[in-house]
């Protein structure tokens, strides 16, 4: 409702009286696709489609080298970046090159690959089902871990000729990593080190308003949002980024709305990039994926999706209740960064996770950081990225 009010005020007074002046000229990347965003800054880009075992067609993007190190044609160490919930590969390239992890890695000599989970803007195709069908959207992060990660990682290993790669996950990108690398030993052997940013397994202590949404009964949630896509990107999101949140008077309102869901850290948000952030987010997922997270909030457990009845769970798991994931079974070396001000990956949940990581190499809690600071914070290079790149160089 407040958004409708704001847009009405802008339409009425903004043009006629010069009120609500923009913070600056718009950023062209707000209206670009992933390949265009990469090449806009002078980096090379390759685009691939990876087909999963169950037929989903995933958009995968590659930055094979940096702007100034193309002369070294030998094999480069490979890094795979996996985004979080309702997000996409654009998260890793949304800031300026010296502030975006994907570009920094490419300039540091790495072969950088960007993944997209099924159902988001860049992975909304299937060999068998149309995105208009309910069947297409019958997935959660279970399937991303079981099918998306193996398909993408195996493709990268085959394409590059590298036996092992570095894996960087943010938010749900860590979740599917924990599942895949603890349940699929063959896949786990292909990972050098797992770099987990704002890691999420249990969400027992999350303080985000999403916690309250999680207690909406499933039947009512489906009545409100349907059974297919959840929070897809729309033209209204673009409008918010270019015409609302880019206004001097309103950027604070937009940033505070973001902070309510992810935790507050005002000084680290580059409001001049709002149009890029909102030009590509949210990128969508399935209603089932969100319901899976709601289930974890209510149960306090890190478990597979509950299909709604003992008989349905028996069909999927051969047991009446969804099985819990055993993170301690993962032997991949892992480095963890979490935020003390993160209300999605709450520090208490992270504290429960850390003892279960049998091969924990490194842990750092950044007290001021919220959930999104790991991908967008202005000081992310100093707090996280430079440290990570140094660790990769020693691996």
Swiss-Prot record:
Signal peptide start-end: 1-18
Family label: Belongs to the AB hydrolase superfamily. Lipase family.
GO biological process: lipid catabolic process; malate metabolic process
Swiss-Prot/TrEMBL catalytic activity: a triacylglycerol + H2O = a diacylglycerol + a fatty acid + H(+); 1,2,3-tri-(9Z-octadecenoyl)-glycerol + H2O = 1,2-di-(9Z-octadecenoyl)-sn-glycerol + (9Z)-octadecenoate + H(+); 1,2,3-trioctanoylglycerol + H2O = 1,2-dioctanoyl-sn-glycerol + octanoate + H(+)
PROSITE patterns tied to this protein: LIPASE_SER
Protein name: Gastric triacylglycerol lipase
SUPFAM superfamilies registered for this protein in UniProt: alpha/beta-Hydrolases
Keyword Ion transport belongs to the record: no
Chief location bin: secreted
Protein EC: 3.1.1.3
Disulfide pairings: 245-254
Domain AB hydrolase-1 positions: 77-376
Pfam families: Abhydro_lipase (PF04083)
InterPro entries, per database record: AB_hydrolase_fold, AB_hydrolase_lipase, Lipase_euk
Sites where a glycan is attached: 33, 68, 98, 270
Function, in words: Catalyzes the hydrolysis of triacylglycerols to yield free fatty acids, diacylglycerol, monoacylglycerol, and glycerol. Shows a preferential hydrolysis at the sn-3 position of triacylglycerol.
Active site, per annotation: 171 (nucleophile), 342 (charge relay system), 371 (charge relay system)
Lineage: superkingdom: Eukaryota
PANTHER family linked: LYSOSOMAL ACID LIPASE-RELATED
GO (cellular component) term, any one: extracellular region
Enzyme class: hydrolase
Subcellular localization, as worded in the UniProt entry: Secreted
Organs and tissues of expression: Secreted by the serous (von Ebner's) glands at the back of the rat tongue.
């Amino acid at each position: 409702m407040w958004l409708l009010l704001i847009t009405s005020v802008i339409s009425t007074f903004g043009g006629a009286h010069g009120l609500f002046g923009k913070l600056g000229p718009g950023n062209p990347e707000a209206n670009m696709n992933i390949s265009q965003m990469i090449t806009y800054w002078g980096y090379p880009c390759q685009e691939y489609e990876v087909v999963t075992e169950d037929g989903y067609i995933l958009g995968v993007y590659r930055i094979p080298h940096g702007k100034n190190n193309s002369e070294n044609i030998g094999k480069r160490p490979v890094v795979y970046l996996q985004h979080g919930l309702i997000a996409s590969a654009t998260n890793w390239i949304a800031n300026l090159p010296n502030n975006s992890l994907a570009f920094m890695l490419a300039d540091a000599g790495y072969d950088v690959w960007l993944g997209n989970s099924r159902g988001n803007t860049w992975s909304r195709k299937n060999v068998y089902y149309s995105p208009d069908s309910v069947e297409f959207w019958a997935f959660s992060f279970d399937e991303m871990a079981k099918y998306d990660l193996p398909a993408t990682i195996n493709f990268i290993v085959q394409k590059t000729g590298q036996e092992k790669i570095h894996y960087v996950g943010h938010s749900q990108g860590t979740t599917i990593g924990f599942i895949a690398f603890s349940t699929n030993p063959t896949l786990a052997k292909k990972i050098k080190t797992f770099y987990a940013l704002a890691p999420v397994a249990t969400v027992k202590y999350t303080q985000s308003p999403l916690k309250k949404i999680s207690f909406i009964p499933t039947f009512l949630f489906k009545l409100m949002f349907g059974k297919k896509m959840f929070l897809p990107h729309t033209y209204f999101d673009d409008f918010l980024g270019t015409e609302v949140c880019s206004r001097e008077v309103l950027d604070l309102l937009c940033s505070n709305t973001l902070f309510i869901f992810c935790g507050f850290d005002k000084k680290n948000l580059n409001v001049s990039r709002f149009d890029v952030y909102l030009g590509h987010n949210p990128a969508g997922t399935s209603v089932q994926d969100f319901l899976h997270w709601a289930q974890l909030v209510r149960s306090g457990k890190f478990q597979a999706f509950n299909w709604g009845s003992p008989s349905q769970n028996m069909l999927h798991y051969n047991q009446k209740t969804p099985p819990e994931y055993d993170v301690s079974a993962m032997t991949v070396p892992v480095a963890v960064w979490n935020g003390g001000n993160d209300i999605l990956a709450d520090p208490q949940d992270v504290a429960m996770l850390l003892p279960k990581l049998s091969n924990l190499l490194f842990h750092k809690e950044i007290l001021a950081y919220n959930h999104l600071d790991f991908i967008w914070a202005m000081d992310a290079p100093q707090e996280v990225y430079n440290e990570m790149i140094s660790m990769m160089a020693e691996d």
